[in-house]
Amino acid sequence: LIKITAAVATGLQLLLTLVLWQNYDAGNGGMQFTVRGEWIPSFNISYILGVDGLSLPMAILTALLCFIGIFVSWNINKAVKGYFALFLLLDTGIMGVFLSMDFFLFYIFWEVMLLPMYFLIGMWGGPQREYAAIKFFLYTLFGSVLMLVGILGLYFTCGNTFDIQVLKQVAPEALQGVTWWGMSAIKV
């Protein structure tokens, strides 16, 4: 049942991203299909999702690869429910990273994405999966801390907001570059 649920969920996600692509106005540019809700108003944290010309293809590719990934993983026999639950949680985290328009929400989705990856590597990985999972954890922990410092730096120096659209307008050009490189350090 969990395999069918995962296949249906990722199939619906793929279908919805293709509908977004069909209805996306490329001539308009900017963010479209925006969903906004106040989340933690005392810290100016909002739940903001949307797509633009860069995030929409990434969302479509994520949906397609996750849909294919379910069927590639169909013959998993070890802890099947746990595997597919972690796979769907990973899918949710990746999709949230591409759709979030609030840095706090982005960071939450980023961490949501990393946890299932750690367990998927550690439990269903190859012969050296424990070593790989620990190494993955240490690298991503270091990168996540650097990214959090960059996000908090933006928050405290640019008007106490995590809203990416607002930050694009108020953040000084130099600060944007420093923050970008700081957040890109997670790739190293």
Enumerate the predicted regions with their spans.
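Alpha-helical multi-pass transmembrane bundles of energy-transducing inner-membrane proteins
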Residues: 1, 82-89, 93-188
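Transmembrane helix-loop-helix hairpins at membrane boundaries of multipass inner-membrane proteins
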Residues: 1-85, 157-182
